[in-house]
Every structure is written in structure tokens, then in C-alpha cells.
Amino acid sequence: MGNVNPKGFRLKIINTWSSIWYAEKGYKQGLHQDLSIRSYINESFKHAGVSKVIIERTIDLVSVIIHSSRPGVIIGKKGSDIEKIKQKIAEKVKNNVEVNVVGVKRSEIDAVLISNSIAQQLEKRVSFRRAMKKAIQSCLRMGARGIKVSCSGRLGGAEIARTEWYKEGRLPLHTLRANIDYAFAEAKTIYGIIGVKVWVYIGN
């Protein structure tokens, strides 16, 4: 048996959904639109430090809230890029669109940003041990109470795939009130795909 996703495990306790809407009809279309919007934003702004995309819907409006460590990259000069994002999303949803960008204050303890950073370093042929240890040190320095980082695949170009992980501090996965952030990223290297998993214990 594998481990349960810490975010899904804590839904409605300390976490909430990233798509906040309900539909009796057209639920499937709405779900596909949400996936398409997130895919477009993550692909278009790979280097903008996108942490999460919250989508809220009403009858005549789709509101997209982008959490990013570098909001200026997404907004562009005088908000020019925001208008482009609105147009692209409006084409997908055929509805009025509102886009807001929120800055991530402590990117060093955001699991999504940590996993993406490690994956990007692995693609640039940085040693996986060095990338993992550097991420752990900066995370704990910023006030996280515990962190675990795991890398799986042909690490360092080895013939046989393996998993290596490092853990510092506490990580109470079965304590539901514990605020644990989790993320998964993939590094596409010349040896194959390396999976990166990150768990961050922020506190209760």
C-alpha cells in the first residue's frame, strides 16, 4: 500500500479545494476547462514560480486566482500579460473572465515551488544530493518545522533506477490538524524522467 496524499487527506479540515464551484449539469465540461486553464498557466509561466491556481465560478463569471512567487512576470508591463491571459481563458470557457495574481510571501516553504526548483536543477545536471540538501536547508531556515524530499529514477545516470530521500525535523503525516504541504514534480533528464516529491510540515 502506498501513502495517501497529505492534501487530500486534510480536505475540509485545514485544506480546501482548488476549484470552488458546483454544477448540476455540465460538470464534466467545467472540469476539463479547469484542467485546460491550469495546464495553460503552468506551461506559459514555468519560470514565474506558479504555486497554485484557484478557480471560482458563478453563473456569468470565471474567476482565476494565480499564486506566484514572481507576480511581476505574470502581470507584465502595465498589466499587458494579464489581458492576454484573460483572452486565452475566455476562448476556453466562453464566459466573462477575471484574473488576479497573488504573491507567495515565503516561497522557500512552498512544496510546489521547492519540487519545481529541484526538478529544474536536475534538468541542468546539478547533483541531486546537492539540490535536495540546499532545498532542505533554506526551507528550515525560513521557519518550516520539518521537510522530506524524495527523488526517484536513474539518479546520476545510474543503470538501475532507485529512490533516495532526505528528511529533517518532524513530519506527522497522520495528525490531521498538522498543516502539511505536498507536491510532486518531474525532471526530464537525458537518462529519463526523475520524480521529485516534497513534504513540508509548516505547523499546526
UniProtKB/Swiss-Prot annotation:
SMART domains cross-referenced by the UniProt entry: KH
Domain KH type-2: 37-105
Keywords, comma-separated and alphabetical: Ribonucleoprotein, Ribosomal protein, RNA-binding, rRNA-binding
GO process terms (BP): translation
Pfam annotation, one family: KH_2
A molecular function GO annotation: structural constituent of ribosome
Entry GO terms, CC: cytosolic small ribosomal subunit
Keyword RNA-binding: yes
Protein's UniProt keywords contain Hydrolase: no
UniProt-listed InterPro entries: KH_dom (IPR004087), KH_dom-like_a/b (IPR015946), KH_dom_type_2 (IPR004044), KH_sf_prok-type (IPR009019), Ribosomal_S3_C_sf (IPR036419), Ribosomal_uS3_bac-typ (IPR005704), Ribosomal_uS3_C (IPR001351), Ribosomal_uS3_CS (IPR018280)
Function statement: Binds the lower part of the 30S subunit head. Binds mRNA in the 70S ribosome, positioning it for translation.
Record-linked HAMAP family: Ribosomal_uS3_B
Subunit structure and binding partners: Part of the 30S ribosomal subunit. Forms a tight complex with proteins S10 and S14.
Family the entry assigns: Belongs to the universal ribosomal protein uS3 family.
PANTHER family per UniProt: 30S/40S RIBOSOMAL PROTEIN S3, SMALL RIBOSOMAL SUBUNIT PROTEIN US3C
Descriptive protein name: Small ribosomal subunit protein uS3
Taxonomic placement: Bacteria, Pseudomonadati, Pseudomonadota, Alphaproteobacteria, Rickettsiales
Gene name linked to the record: rpsC
